[in-house]
Structures are given as C-alpha cells and as structure tokens.
Amino acid sequence: LVRYPGNPLLEPIEEHPWESKYVLNPGALRFGDKVYLFYRAVGHDGISHIGLAITDGYKVLERLPEPIFSPSTPEERMGCEDPRLVVVEDKIVMLYTAYDGNLAQIAAASITLEDFLSGNYRAWKREGLAFKNIWDKDAILFPERIGGKYIVYHRIEPSIWVTYSREIKFPIKEKHAIILGPRPGRMWDSLKIGSGA
C-alpha cells in the first residue's frame, strides 16, 4: 500500500457547526465515475450527523453544506454514526449506528435511487432498529441474497455476529449467531473485532 499524497480528503469545517470537530468513518457508493462518501460528522456539541461528499475517487468535486441525515428519534439523540450503504434493487439501504448517549443500536434507512441520483439527498425513510435494546454496531448488509437470504454482519461486543433474513425488514426477527470472536492473548485484535466496511 502507498499512502495517497492528497490526504486528507475531508477535514472538519469550522463554519459548519454540525461538522466542526471531526469527519470520519465514511461509507461509500460508486455510480459511474463518481464516488459518494457518506461520512460521520461531529460538531462541538458532540452530536453525529451524516454528510455527503462527491468525489472522483481522489479529489472532492462537491461537498454538501448541510447534513443529508440527522438525528430525529430518541434512539439517535446523540447521533447517527458510521453509515454503511448498499444498493438493493431500486433503492439504497443504509445501516448506521443510532446513539442516544448510553446505548448504540443498529438502525436502517433507505432512499430510492431515483431520489438520490436526482439530488434529492434528504428523502431518506427510516426503516427502524435492527435489534432493539442491544448494544450493537458495525453493521453491513450484503446487497444480494445468498442461498435465498440476505446477510447482515454486525458487532455485539466483542464479536462479529451474522443474521440471515429472507427480506430486508426491520426489526430483524431472525436469530443471530457469533461467527468470529477476538483472539486470545495480547494481540491487536484480542479486545474486540467488527465487520468494518
């Protein structure tokens, strides 16, 4: 690997209160020659929002001055974090972490491809929590069925869990199970692991 000399691609913008402290941990989607970065943004109030930057993969072509997704439910009181997105049929499905200041939970939202590609970036529909009242983060959804089912990887600390579901519907009713845990000992991955991006 070679570090890209144009880093950092995104930095906080002091004049934007919602992203004045940190920008981090983006999910990405590629459409044509553009890469859309859905990034976690934190202001000095400590609340996380999701911003959007449109890139060619190396430089930012456009960065929206307002968040495209902001907290609006009690479970999101302290933020919407760490978006992970996939295209499923005619819509984009986003799994993210809803955080109320005490409990982090996986939540889902969707937007039609038509709305998104026409620039109607705030037309998201909240789909609900994946597993209510369970501390859970780092969720990723496979965009296609495997063996007739959708697969969600997620992290109930300290391990990576998997859930299989016949449909993308929240809350997820199917059972989930650990597929990979931390290694024992004093290793770089011995405390906790997650599915990441």
For each predicted feature, which ranges?
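Beta-rich carbohydrate-recognition and catalytic domains
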Residues: 1-21, 25-78, 87-140, 144-194
